[in-house]
Amino acid sequence: MITKRIIPCLDVKDGRVVKGVQFVQLRDAGDPVELAKFYDKQGADELVFLDISASHEGRKTMVEVVEKVAAQLAIPFTVGGGINSLDDMKTILRAGADKVSLNTAAVRNPNLITEGADFFGSQCIVVAIDAKYDETIGSWRVYTHGGRNATDLEVVEWAKEAVRRGAGEILLTSMDCDGEKNGFDIALTRTVSEAVSVPVIASGGAGNAKHFLEVFEKGKADAALAASIFHYKETSVKEVKAYLKERGVNIR
């Protein structure tokens, strides 16, 4: 039986972890290396870092952060945000990341997925999809640029294409549920999980341990990601894992 993974997510801007509500009202949440060590001790299975600094200066800082984090961590970590070329992937992976996450760049240039998978192997390539339900198409639409721009892509079709091109994992964020803390988007997660052959990481909406149970059992997710509930200490990775274990979920 495949082990389910719990993954905290850190948004990094200019070398610091920040947290906000729907991409705005950002507040400093500390040093990424210290937080990474904290989550590692708590029993996180992996970590995701999203670089939200748009600046070139911020990008250099991110490489330094990745190097420092890699020196401290035993668990795998993924870095996303602003990775636009094979060279960008090389830089981040050489700095010590285990995987790179492609979002907007992959939509703009789907060939980037293929290039990355051919060069590094599918296990290094995560395609992140920001999804929002659209009644006009009766399904979910793909958004880019941090959820600001709607595309013509339908989520399930795009997820399948990403996997065909070599994505080893899909990081699926529900924009409808994000930050609401009312639970993950079960319908979205299940639909994508059943359509692709690679692991799906559910993201957006975690409010308590029960939500993780639901997304694993009903949403068929392989992993679940959360940010604010862990950062704000509303619950901990340890507590979530204990809750899941008691209910027979196979976790590390």
Swiss-Prot record:
Its EC number is 4.3.2.10. This is Imidazole glycerol phosphate synthase subunit HisF. Its main location: cytoplasm. Heterodimer of HisH and HisF. Keywords: Amino-acid biosynthesis, Cytoplasm, Histidine biosynthesis, Lyase. PANTHER family: IMIDAZOLE GLYCEROL PHOSPHATE SYNTHASE HISHF, IMIDAZOLE GLYCEROL PHOSPHATE SYNTHASE SUBUNIT HISF/H IGP SYNTHASE SUBUNIT HISF/H. SUPFAM superfamilies: Ribulose-phoshate binding barrel. It comes from the Bacteria. The gene is hisF. The active site is at residues 11, 130. Belongs to the HisA/HisF family. It comes from Geobacillus sp. (strain WCH70). Pathway: Amino-acid biosynthesis; L-histidine biosynthesis; L-histidine from 5-phospho-alpha-D-ribose 1-diphosphate: step 5/9.
